[in-house]
């Protein structure tokens, strides 16, 4: 997969292009030694990347959360879990490809993994409905959660959606009811639930698999009731004010941690999760393992009480 750069990364992209060009020349003509120049440019690129990513504003973080190269749920499943067995369908209407889920092992322990899934190619994006689930997707997720509850398996969810699908068919099949039912049922599950926002956390579409004992966010992910463009269109009547909206919405991991709405921020590799997927997956795996260890001593009653108190604390500063 070719590397893509956002506009604020263009100076970095130019340096990387120069490095690749020098490497190509060096490989074509072994008599030309360009190692020192390549090392100098690599150091300069790393320093520029550090400087750029040390000062990202909320709008830039929003765009990083949607980066086309960013790892999706199936990428993390491949790197973190073993023996993944995908389960399909809501047993009522259809199998929604915008939600993936199934049984897997995490360091040998059976777990239920559920997450939003976007696509990379045009065909795959359409098949996954751009990561926007219909009611049958959320009902599939709930079916798998109830299965995990019966067999005492921890539930791991990965959140990455611009929102629930707002189409007429989805509304006719009960989109709001499906989301509301998931919120209610997840609050009562008797097994540990660990949720992580890996990209976009868009409104009720994210919350429908986001009620948990631990809620984490990747460093450059977002979590909000509406997209910055949507907010700008409502408040300023112009999507061009999206950058202003992003700042006032408080949608970054750092801001939500300050408000105690999430538990942990999972560090991303320099330049974002897509720059080193294996390292990002390892960071996320260690956070999930730490969360499971933290929840392990709790009895079912304590787990449910802790989750209830957590939910009831929302809205208080």
From Swiss-Prot:
Q: What is its main location?
A: cytoplasm
A Pfam family found in this protein is ACCA
Q: What pathway does the UniProt record associate with this protein?
A: Lipid metabolism; malonyl-CoA biosynthesis; malonyl-CoA from acetyl-CoA: step 1/1
What EC numbers are recorded for this enzyme?
2.1.3.15
User: Which terms are listed as keywords in the entry?
Assistant: ATP-binding, Cytoplasm, Fatty acid biosynthesis, Fatty acid metabolism, Lipid biosynthesis, Lipid metabolism, Nucleotide-binding, Transferase
Q: Which InterPro entries match?
A: Acetyl_CoA_COase_a_su, ClpP/crotonase-like_dom_sf, COA_CT_C
The GO molecular function terms of this record are: acetyl-CoA carboxylase activity; ATP binding; carboxyl- or carbamoyltransferase activity
As for what it does, the entry says: Component of the acetyl coenzyme A carboxylase (ACC) complex. First, biotin carboxylase catalyzes the carboxylation of biotin on its carrier protein (BCCP) and then the CO(2) group is transferred by the carboxyltransferase to acetyl-CoA to form malonyl-CoA.
Recorded protein name is Acetyl-coenzyme A carboxylase carboxyl transferase subunit alpha
Organism per entry:
Actinobacillus pleuropneumoniae serotype 5b (strain L20)
Q: Which gene encodes it?
A: accA
């Amino acid at each position: 997969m070719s590397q893509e750069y956002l506009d604020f990364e263009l100076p970095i992209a130019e340096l990387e292009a120069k490095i690749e060009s020098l490497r190509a020349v060096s490989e074509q003509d072994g008599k030309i030694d360009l190692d020192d120049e390549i090392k100098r440019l690599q150091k300069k690129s790393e320093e520029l990347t550090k400087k750029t990513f040390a000062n990202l504003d909320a709008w830039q973080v929003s765009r990083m959360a949607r980066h086309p190269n960013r790892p999706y749920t199936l990428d993390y499943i491949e790197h973190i879990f073993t023996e993944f067995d995908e389960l399909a369908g809501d047993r009522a209407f259809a199998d929604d490809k915008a939600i993936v889920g199934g049984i897997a092992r995490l360091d040998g322990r059976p777990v239920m993994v559920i997450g939003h899934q976007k696509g990379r190619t045009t065909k795959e994006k359409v098949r996954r409905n751009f990561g926007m689930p219909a009611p049958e997707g959320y009902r599939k997720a709930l079916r798998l959660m109830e299965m995990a509850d019966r067999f005492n398996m921890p539930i791991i969810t990965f959140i990455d959606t611009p929102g629930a699908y707002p189409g007429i068919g989805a509304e006719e099949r009960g989109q709001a009811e499906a989301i509301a039912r998931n919120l209610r049922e997840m609050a009562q599950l008797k097994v540990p639930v660990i949720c992580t926002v890996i990209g976009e956390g868009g409104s009720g579409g994210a919350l429908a698999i986001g009620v948990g004992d631990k809620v984490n966010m990747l460093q450059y992910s977002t979590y909000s009731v509406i997209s910055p463009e949507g907010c700008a269109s409502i408040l300023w009547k112009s999507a061009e004010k999206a950058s202003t909206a992003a700042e006032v919405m408080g949608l970054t991991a750092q801001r939500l941690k300050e408000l105690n709405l999430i538990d942990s921020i999972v560090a991303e590799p320099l330049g974002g999760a897509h720059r080193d997927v294996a390292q990002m997956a390892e960071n996320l795996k260690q956070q999930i393992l730490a969360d499971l260890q933290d929840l392990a001593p709790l009895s079912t009653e304590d787990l449910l009480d802790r989750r209830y108190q957590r939910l009831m604390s929302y809205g208080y500063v």
